[in-house]
Each structure stands twice: as C-alpha cells, then as structure tokens.
Amino acid sequence: MWLFTVNQVLRKMQRRHSSNTDNIPPERNRSQALSSEASVDEGGVFESLKAEAASPPALFSGLSGSLPTSSFPSSLVLGSSAGGGDVFIQMPASREEGGGRGEGGAYHHRQPHHHFHHGGHRGGSLLQHVGGDHRGHSEEGGDEQPGTPAPALSELKAVICWLQKGLPFILILLAKLCFQHKLGIAVCIGMASTFAYANSTLREQVSLKEKRSVLVILWILAFLAGNTLYVLYTFSSQQLYNSLIFLKPNLETLDFFDLLWIVGIADFVLKYITIALKCLIVALPKIILAVKSKGKFYLVIEELSQLFRSLVPIQLWYKYIMGDDSSNSYFLGGVLIVLYSLCKSFDICGRVGGVRKALKLLCTSQNYGVRATGQQCTEAGDICAICQAEFREPLILLCQHVFCEECLCLWLDRERTCPLSRSVAVDTLRCWKDGATSAHFQVY
C-alpha cells in the first residue's frame, strides 16, 4: 500500500516538472524556465506531498526504523530545458533574503546571478553582442569629442585679434606720418587728380576722331603746363627738375621719404609731357596725319615714355643705397646695388622690347580687310554698325561684316574681335593705341 502511494507521488512530481518545461516555447527556453521555477516557493516543490498526505510520519510509520531521515534543501532548485541541452542552477538564498521574505510574507523574485550555458551558438551570440556594444560606445565617445579648428582659421583669428588690439596704435602712427608730410601728400593728390582728368579728357577727344575740339586740346595743354610750372616753381630751392635730366636735386639728405618725393614728382611731370605730346597728335588735321594712323603714334609715344620713366629713378636709388654717411658698409651697399641693377636690367629690357615692337608696327601697314563693293554695302544696309552713319571707305572683314575704315581702325585699337560676330580680326591686342597713358607709379 505504501509503495503504491509513493509511486503516485513521484509520478505527480514528474508530471509537474514536465508541464513546467514542455510548455515553454523554443525561443524562451532557459530564461523563462528559470523564472517559473524561481517563482515557486522554496518549499513549494513538495506542496503536493503535504496536500495528499497530511502527516508524513503516518505514511512512513512502517519504515521509520529502517529509513534514515534526511532534510531536503528547500532552497536548491535544479532544472533543465526539454531537449535544449541547457542546465541551470539556482544558488541558495542568503539568510537576509530569507528573513526578509519571512517578515514580508510575500515572495519577491530576484534574478539569478550565475547562469551556466552549454551550447556554442549562445556563447558566440553573447560575445558578438558584447563586442557590438563596446564598439558602439567607442564610436559614440569618438563622436562626442569636440573638433579642433583648422590651423588656418586659428591663425586668421589670431591676426584679427592682433589687429583689433594694435589698430589704434597703427592709426596713431599713420596720423603722425601724414601730419609730418602733409604738404607732400597734398601735392601728390593734386597732381594725381590733374593726371586723371587730363587722361580721361584726351581719350574722349581721340574717340571723337575728326570731331575733336581743338579748344579742349589747348585747354589740356595749358592746364598741364600750369600745374607743372607751379610745382617746380614752388619747390625751386630743391631743384626737382634736375632729376628729369639724371642729375641730383638740391637736398642735404636723402632718406626714404625724400626719395619717394623726388621720384613721384618726376614721374608725374613725365606723364604730363606724355599727354601733351599725344594732344599734339590729336590736334593734327586729317590732311597731315590720317585718323587710322594716329593710334600707332600714340603707341610709340607711350612706349618711349615708359622707357624714359623707368630710367629716371636709377641714379636716385644709387644715391640712396650708398648713402652719404661714411660709416655705412660699402660691402652691403655694393651688394644691394648689384641686386638693384640686375632687377632693373630686366625691367629695362622689357621696355626696350616694347619700343622695338611699337616702331616696327609704325613702319608697317596694317590691313584689317579688303575694300567692300557697292553690292556688299547694300546687303549690309548701307549703315555702319559702329558710327550708325553711311559707309565711308568701307572695309569687309573675313566674317563678311562691313564697317567704315576709320571706325574699324579705332575699334581694333581697343579690341581684337569683330564688333558683330566677335570673331578674331587681329592677332594680338595692342594697348595704348586709344590715347590712354599708363597710371603706373614708377617708384624704382
């Protein structure tokens, strides 16, 4: 009888255990089996024994003398998933947890601290998960690092900061220099304004061709001559005109600002002379010099002027480099003079080449096209596209466009393409054939 009862109890225990493990889905095999087993009371595994057998001593009274009594550790729970190959162990709870549960009267689930897995795929996925988390944290840490500014930007900020701090002192220094040389600055501004006015007026008269005004040309000549004579007379004690003929002006010392003063006055005077010579060319009537040929003379005058302007400062720079003080180093002065001479020789060679090309162009005739027939003029509308008047000595270009000869020559003195089709009509662009004068300040 008692064997039958024990057999029933063991079968119930097996059915309870199999129901707890077989009902778990495959993807929730181990963790939920652990939670279901852990949610049972520590002594609840044997509650079925207590329910059916109210008094264990009565059931096993016949074997009390032959079977030793042993206490089952209520806190030890063994479990295994059905067919999963995983074994998990719940370690005994501490005394504090047991006491707390007893006092509270309710069981609070606590996650197990240690899990032992048997299966290569679970270990591999866990390592991959940990490695991925580690890489993710490292990438987030790299993204959070503040970017450093570029070196060029930091240097620019430093320069701007320095300028903000030093700008007041720079302005004070400039104000002091301007006050010391106020007379020279005023004279240079006046001469520059005179040059700009005369140059623009002359170009306007050149573009008018035969309709130019002789009175305006005479006014330009008188205006330039008056300014030149006034400046030279005002500073006659310095004998600034000597620099125009490669002589030394009358100055006790020659510092850097004195050098700029003498070179600047000489350069402006030579520009005035250049404009005056071009005014004489403009004033010549058509009988003496044709309008289409005047551009060549403008070019020759300008190239000769630039060559002469580049030669004037040489003796002044030699004087400034060597100096009047005997304590100066002759070796350093000699080296600087050699370097200056080399640089200046390249500049002069370029100027000489420009003069040679201008003279060659002056001696050769330039044909931009051939004479147009009456039929070609009729097909073109009998109106010049440049002057908007009837054709006078019409020329036809390779692009089959017809223009007046004078209009075409004046146009090609500034441009190198056809006014209508923009096809190339001349090989090279020739500057200074429109009567303009270079505003370049020849300081060296």
Curated annotation (Swiss-Prot):
Keyword Membrane in annotation: yes
Entries under SMART domains matching the protein: RING
Keywords: Membrane, Metal-binding, Transmembrane, Transmembrane helix, Ubl conjugation pathway, Zinc, Zinc-finger
Gene Ontology BP terms: positive regulation of ERAD pathway
Region listing for Disordered, in residue ranges: 13-41, 92-149
Pfam families: zf-C3HC4_2
UniProt membrane topology term: Multi-pass membrane protein
Cystine pairs: none
All ranges on the Cytoplasmic side of the membrane: 203-214, 277-329
Localization in the cell: Membrane
GO molecular function, one term: ubiquitin protein ligase activity
Record InterPro entries: RNFT1/2, Znf_RING, Znf_RING/FYVE/PHD, Znf_RING_CS
Gene Ontology cellular component terms for the protein in this record: membrane
Entry function: E3 ubiquitin-protein ligase that negatively regulates IL3-dependent cellular responses through IL3RA ubiquitination and degradation by the proteasome, having an anti-inflammatory effect.
Protein's UniProt name: RING finger and transmembrane domain-containing protein 2
Organism of provenance: Pongo abelii (Sumatran orangutan)
Lineage: Eukaryota, Metazoa, Chordata, Craniata, Vertebrata
